[in-house]
């Protein structure tokens, strides 16, 4: 899922190296923040960030999707250090995050719950049931980052199941909404660090580009699940070096 991974590189980097109260030596800390990768198919980038953050050896990345690997094709909590929830079936991440945020509130915990969800994923009705509950219970310890790259497996999101105007929908469901350029680190960090806990769940609509950073991948829906091969790998790496 190369295209899906590349749209969220900055999102995950900002979270793990600037925002989240998590650490490899505190995996069971009851006060740690929790991050959920709701768009579970985009796990390749997630593994890279976890490795760089020290949750497991970088060498493990060479075993991605191998038989009996610690790094399967979708997040599995029982296999990979740092993973909080098994995901991949779209529409499951937000309902679980709402439950975790509610539990934290009831136990007077200071932890926050973060998740990244794709815009195509928002066609799943379970997200909006969860959003209603989050607003009803005033879960201002919940931060939803919407990776809005406007593409999904079969084409443009607006043609498959249009969710625009997205900000208006989130606000109608009782969320505090902000927007940023999700592939621009400065814009993204400013949006996250500017969040306020004022009785409403927070939604950041991160406007991103699917396949960002690689010219022959970005903005093309066929790269939702394609993998570069041969000369494509060399070209992609060369372009990334220039970024």
Regions found by a protein language model. Name each.
Residues 4-8, 31, 42, 57-60, ...:
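General structural feature for long, well-ordered alpha-helical segments within catalytic domains
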Residues 1:
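Globin-like tetrapyrrole-binding proteins
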Residues 185, 189-243:
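Glycine/aspartate-rich loop-and-adjacent alpha/beta segment that forms the canonical ThDP
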Residues 10, 41-42, 149-150, 184, ...:
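Glycine-rich beta-alpha junction loops
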Residues 47-48, 76, 126-128, 154-158, ...:
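Short acidic, glycine/serine/threonine-rich loops at helix termini
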Residues 6-136:
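Cofactor-binding active-site loop characterized by glycine-rich and histidine/acidic residues
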Residues 82, 86-196:
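Thiamine diphosphate
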């Amino acid at each position: 899922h190369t295209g899906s991974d590349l749209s969220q590189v900055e999102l995950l980097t900002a979270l793990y190296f600037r925002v989240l109260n998590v650490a490899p030596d505190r995996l069971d800390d009851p006060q740690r923040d929790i991050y959920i990768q709701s768009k579970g198919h985009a796990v390749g980038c997630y593994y890279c960030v976890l490795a760089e953050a020290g949750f497991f050896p970088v060498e493990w990345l060479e075993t991605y999707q191998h038989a009996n690997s610690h790094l399967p094709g979708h997040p599995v909590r029982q296999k990979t250090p740092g993973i909080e929830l098994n995901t991949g079936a779209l529409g499951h991440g937000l309902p679980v995050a709402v439950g975790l945020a509610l539990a934290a509130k009831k136990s007077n915990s200071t932890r926050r719950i973060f998740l990244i969800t794709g815009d195509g994923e928002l066609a799943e009705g379970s997200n909006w049931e969860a959003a209603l509950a989050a607003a009803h219970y005033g879960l201002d310890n919940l931060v939803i980052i919407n990776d809005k790259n406007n593409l999904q497996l079969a084409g443009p999101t607006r043609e498959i199941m249009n969710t625009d105007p997205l900000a208006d929908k989130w606000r109608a469901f009782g969320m505090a909404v902000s927007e940023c350029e999700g592939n621009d680190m400065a814009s993204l960090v400013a949006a996250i660090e500017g969040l306020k806990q004022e009785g409403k769940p927070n939604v950041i609509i991160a406007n991103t580009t699917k396949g960002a950073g690689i010219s022959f991948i970005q903005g093309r829906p066929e790269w939702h699940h394609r993998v570069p091969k041969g000369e494509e790998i060399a070209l992609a790496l060369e372009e990334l070096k220039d970024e």
